[in-house]
Design a protein with these regions (language model features):
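A generic "folded-domain core" signal
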Residues: 11-154
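Hydrophobic h-region of N-terminal signal peptides that target proteins for export
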Residues: 2-13
Length: 154
């Protein structure tokens, strides 16, 4: 069900499917060329269109870049923390998006995701209430690899 919803969401936006792997999908945008693994939360406390993605932008030399869309807007100065197993990463964030502060952190996050079972993104909502979006990581390694291959052969 999650995979089907992911496919419909992404196909509706003109993306080319590269495969669906458990709760993660891999897709390619033709112009500008970029490929990504993407998933919706397995559990979320908000109501928005939350997702986590790991993107490759070949023309920009970007590989394995994390992007999180939060399920609700966060409080202006609230920290956003990504947890994978016992690893914790503080993310940079906008009102409803978060990302790693640098490529080294992206690399560490992706390595943790490949070995993890689940990850959660925690912060405070605009009203001050804590919330978390939780993602199952089964299939993430294969989806990331499929996205990398999808852009490598183009």
């Amino acid at each position: 069900v999650i995979a089907a919803a992911l496919t419909l969401l992404v196909l509706a936006q003109g993306r080319i499917p590269l495969g669906v792997f458990e709760s993660w999908g891999a897709f390619r945008d033709p112009s500008p060329p970029r490929c990504f693994a993407i998933a919706r939360p397995a559990g979320q406390s908000g109501r928005g269109e939350a997702f986590a993605s790991i993107a490759t932008w070949p023309r920009e030399g970007v590989r394995n870049q994390l992007h999180i869309r939060l399920s609700r807007p966060r409080a202006a100065n609230a920290r956003v923390t990504l947890s994978v197993g016992d690893r914790r990463f503080e993310l940079k964030a906008g009102a409803a998006d978060a990302w790693a502060p640098d490529w080294r952190t992206d690399t560490a996050i992706v390595a943790a995701m490949r070995d993890g079972r689940s990850m959660s993104v925690e912060t405070l909502a605009a009203n001050g209430a804590p919330f978390a979006d939780t993602y199952a990581l089964k299939g993430v390694a294969t989806a990331i690899d499929a996205a990398a291959v999808g852009c490598a052969r183009r």
